[in-house]
């Protein structure tokens, strides 16, 4: 090797290799041992866990990178956050955070000595202990890595608007085969070195997944190099299996990469260079299960898929495996690494950074510590003047867009708010954001482009996965964000939502040192009832059903019926912490029902009787309760009420509108739930309830099944009927229209029985006219198009 490739002195090389051995020893101990952590006595059955869980294969590589990043931090005084894409290598991160002293500060019972080491080993993947992955309980983690694909987008999200932060992102070669990860490579086209930090991707090629080779490990060097160049990176290769050689190569490569990062940032921040740079990245090829047993039961282990999880698992009852484990553990020579009391030797402790520079204690990984309140204008100032219900038409998102625009403006200096979306910001009627900012764009630009800028704060890439990953990384490191998306296509990130909801559940309820972060706010529009022009593929309101499966401590669902209520809900969501808020509202021109103060009162309650639409106030109990949730169901309900007033003026109708869907659940099930007495007072205990709902109707039954009057509840909603047709035909196809609602009342209100036949005939006639009209003219009937609440 030349001098340029050997930056480590013999002494430093020995120390770094020893530190790596210590991390590997602790990792194996976590997987296998529950006692005898320093092997002071011969290994026996009582020392071995009864159930061996964990993943060894990726772990030594993660440990190797950690010690090298520690060297970079010490030498350059950098802030680096470690993101482990192969989060199943949980033992590695736990081991390193313990070695640097952070773990014992967060968990004093896991002390920095032999007793603490024993507890460290015993607790791993053990009942009452810690999970097997880089879970929220791991200091320094913002990425559990259980579900693969999101490491790189999380890394970029973390460094946006964090100019002094570097995210070292380890990408497993299995993870690199996922769709989200493949797209996330393009995040470098959105990273501005002047105002953002940097990401150092490390593609860890250990060759195998659970039982198969990985694609990127089996293509040629040239093909892989060209792939990374094509993504816009400058790849460096560190490949081999000899530890001493690999340490020198990795140290030299990391020095070069961090030199290049510093130069890229200097040129952007000092020289004013604006073109997109080629950011460095590392391809790190090492054996799977490196330093582990080479052969188990006559079959290859190290460098094979067989080392992916536990290389051998019958230790307690297999003397050969017991001896193999003991030999493996002793190969790390723990007596050279720890004192007799289990304390890491002082010269090895010196390799770790100090204080908040430690990757396990970096404040960015506990974003709530850094979170600052958004500066926000009074949302009431953006409201629509509604003199009377149904007297004004408007596109609900537009006032919200002006509100978001000014939030962007007021927080320009703090640089802690961004809006995310898959190429839909303008389509979703949020275009007024562009009066204040632009779309972030570091790739090539043409004179004809619209609102592209190196300094934009609207993040658009046609990948819901990448948008979600960016936003999660941004929130987890202490900032605020807003995600707008077509309702049907938010399903693309169903699983990412799952993982973030799980993270919030654990951090909020089980880990007191994790400070609350800003909520993840979804605005879903272009929704099912106004996707008549795009057709069946764009018609799906089921994300709500998916969301409500999660813990009530985490999720909130809002269905504001008009623009002023949308403003009120948005204001509330942006101020909230540790939630996932889902807001669903249409973007097409629609009637406005509530003045601003009425909207605020209604949204604060989450549910309420609309007295102006009801006629039962002084008449005792109503004959029927007509409930609605969602803007189009609200419109159809009010249209049905107007028809019923004409056909059955004596009918006492109570109109209930639901903004906060979780109010329907009992108070014991959700903190927003109505008490049973309040629910019964509003919905009665024995009168028919006709409920027009935005989504799949059975969700309402599920939320209300414990309520007294559930047996009288009849729900209309989306029944998976759709095509390219007219807006009103969409609700007719799903029997959510005003005419079907009128028929439902006629069928269920006993006092209407004498005239029910006439009412239902009226309904049938109108539905026939509707179908004939749209077939002939291609648009809805004038009485539908021109309908208004006002007389």
Curated annotation (Swiss-Prot):
Q: What class of enzyme is it?
A: lyase
Q: List the SUPFAM superfamilies.
A: Thiamin diphosphate-binding fold (THDP-binding)
EC identifiers of the protein: 4.1.2.-
- Has the keyword Acyltransferase been applied to this entry? no
What CDD domains does the record point to? TPP_PK
Tell me the GO molecular function terms: aldehyde-lyase activity
Q: Name one GO biological process term.
A: carbohydrate metabolic process
Q: Which cofactor does it need?
A: thiamine diphosphate
One Pfam match, given by its short name, reads: XFP_C
The family annotation for this protein states: Belongs to the XFP family.
Q: Which NCBIfam families match?
A: PRK05261.1-1 (NF003616), PRK05261.1-2 (NF003617), PRK05261.1-4 (NF003619), PRK05261.1-6 (NF003621)
- Descriptive protein name: Probable phosphoketolase
């Amino acid at each position: 090797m030349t001098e340029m490739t050997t930056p480590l002195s013999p002494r430093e090389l020995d120390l770094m290799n020893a530190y790596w051995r210590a991390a590997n020893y602790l990792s194996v101990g976590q997987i296998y041992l529950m006692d005898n952590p320093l092997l002071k006595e011969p290994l026996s059955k009582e020392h071995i866990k009864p159930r061996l869980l964990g993943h060894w294969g990726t772990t030594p590589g993660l440990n190797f990178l950690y010690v090298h990043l520690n060297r970079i931090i010490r030498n350059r005084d950098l802030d680096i956050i470690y993101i482990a894409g192969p989060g199943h290598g949980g033992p590695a991160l736990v081991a390193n955070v313990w070695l640097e002293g952070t773990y014992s500060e967060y968990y004093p019972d896991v002390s920095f000595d032999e007793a603490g080491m024993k507890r460290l080993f015993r607790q791993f993947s053990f009942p009452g202990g810690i999970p097997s992955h880089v879970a929220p309980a791991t200091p320094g983690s913002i990425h559990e890595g259980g579900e693969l694909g999101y490491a790189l987008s999380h890394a970029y999200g973390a460094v946006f608007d964090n100019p002094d932060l570097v995210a070292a992102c380890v990408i497993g070669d299995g993870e690199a085969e996922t769709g989200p990860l493949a797209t996330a490579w393009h995040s470098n086209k959105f990273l501005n070195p002047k105002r953002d930090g940097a990401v150092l991707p490390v593609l860890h090629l250990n060759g195998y997944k659970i039982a198969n080779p990985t694609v990127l490990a089996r293509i040629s060097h040239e093909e892989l190099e060209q792939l990374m160049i094509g993504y816009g990176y400058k790849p460096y290769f560190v490949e081999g299996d000899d530890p001493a050689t690999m340490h020198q190569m990795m140290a030299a490569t990391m020095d070069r990469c961090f030199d290049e990062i510093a130069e890229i940032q200097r040129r952007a921040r000092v020289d004013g260079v604006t073109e997109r740079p080629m950011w460095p990245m590392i391809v790190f090829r090492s054996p799977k299960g490196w330093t582990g047993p080479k052969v188990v039961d006559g079959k290859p282990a190290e460098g094979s898929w067989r080392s992916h999880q536990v290389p051998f698992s019958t230790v307690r009852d297999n003397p050969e495996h017991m001896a193999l484990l003991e030999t493996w553990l002793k190969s790390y020579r723990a007596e050279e690494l720890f004192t007799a009391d289990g304390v890491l030797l002082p010269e090895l402790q010196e390799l770790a950074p100090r204080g908040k520079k430690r990757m396990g204690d970096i404040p960015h990984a506990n974003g709530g510590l850094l979170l600052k309140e958004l500066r926000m204008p009074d949302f009431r100032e953006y409201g629509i003047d509604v003199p009377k219900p149904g007297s004004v038409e408007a596109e609900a998102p537009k006032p919200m867009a002006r509100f978001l625009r000014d939030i962007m403006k007021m927080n320009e200096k703090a640089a802690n708010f961004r809006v995310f979306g898959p190429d839909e910001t303008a389509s979703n009627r949020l275009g007024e954001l562009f009066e204040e900012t632009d779309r972030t764009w570091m790739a090539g630009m043409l004179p004809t482009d619209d609102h592209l800028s190196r300094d934009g704060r609207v993040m658009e890439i046609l990948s819901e996965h990448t948008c979600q990953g960016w936003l999660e990384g941004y929130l987890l490191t202490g900032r605020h964000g807003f995600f707008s998306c077509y309702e049907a296509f938010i399903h693309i990130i169903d699983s990412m939502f799952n993982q973030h909801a799980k993270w919030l559940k654990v951090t909020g309820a089980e880990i007191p040192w994790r400070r609350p972060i800003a909520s993840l706010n979804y605005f879903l529009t272009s929704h099912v009832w106004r996707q008549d022009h795009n057709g069946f593929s764009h018609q799906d309101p089921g994300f709500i059903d998916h969301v409500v499966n999660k813990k009530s401590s985490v999720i909130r669902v809002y269905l504001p019926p008009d623009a002023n209520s949308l403003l009120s809900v948005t204001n509330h969501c942006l101020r909230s912490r540790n939630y996932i808020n889902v807001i669903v509202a249409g973007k097409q021109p629609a009637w406005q029902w509530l003045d601003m103060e009425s909207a605020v009162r209604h949204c604060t309650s989450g549910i309420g009787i609309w007295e102006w639409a009801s006629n039962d106030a002084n008449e005792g109990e109503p004959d029927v309760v007509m409930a609605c949730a969602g803007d189009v169901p609200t419109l159809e309900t009010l249209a049905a009420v107007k028809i019923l007033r004409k056909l059955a003026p004596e009918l006492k109708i109570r109109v209930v509108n639901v903004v906060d869907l979780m109010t329907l659940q009992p108070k014991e099930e959700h903190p927003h739930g109505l008490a049973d007495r309040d629910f019964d007072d509003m919905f009665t205990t024995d009168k028919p309830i006709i409920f027009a709902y935005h989504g799949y109707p059975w969700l309402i039954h599920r939320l209300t099944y414990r309520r007294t009057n559930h047996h009288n509840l009849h729900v209309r909603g989306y029944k998976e009927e759709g095509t390219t047709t007219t807006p009103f035909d969409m609700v007719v196809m799903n029997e959510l229209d005003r005419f079907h609602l009128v028929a439902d009342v006629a069928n269920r209100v006993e006092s209407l029985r004498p005239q029910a036949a006439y009412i239902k005939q009226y309904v049938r006639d109108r539905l026939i006219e509707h179908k004939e009209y749209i077939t002939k003219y291609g648009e809805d009937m004038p009485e539908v198009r021109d309908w208004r609440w006002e007389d």
